[in-house]
Amino acid sequence: MKTKTPQENPEFHLGQLLKAELARQGRTATWLAKQVHCIPENIYKAYRSQWISMPLLFEICKALDYDFFKECSAYLEAEKTN
C-alpha cells in the first residue's frame, strides 16, 4: 500500500490549524497580517491552504507564539507509524 504524501492527505490542513489557533487567541486575520507584514488576503489564502510556505509559517509562529512546525512534525511521526 502506497503511503500518501502530506499533500495527498486531507486530514492534515495547516491553514485550518492556523485559523483555529487565531480564534483560540482571539486574534484576527488583519492583526496577524500586520504582525507578519502582509495583507489580510494572504492570511485568508493561508486559511484555505493545506500547506503554508516556510518563511510565512516561521513569521506566523513568532507572531502567535505557537509552534506550527511541531504540528507538522507530529503529523510526520504519525504517518511513519501508519
Name what the model sees in each region:
Residues 37-52:
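Recognition helix of helix-turn-helix/homeodomain-like DNA-binding domains
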Residues 24, 35, 63:
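Residues within the alpha-helical elements of helix-turn-helix
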Residues 28-33:
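Short alpha-helical "recognition helix" segments of helix-turn-helix
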Residues 49-62:
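Short, basic-rich loop-to-helix N-cap that marks the start of a DNA-contacting helix
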Residues 44-45, 58, 72:
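Key DNA-contacting residues within the recognition helix of helix-turn-helix
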Residues 65-82:
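Short C-terminal boundary/hinge segments that cap the last helix of small helical domains
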Residues 1-27:
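A short, Lys/Arg-rich alpha-helix, primarily the initiator
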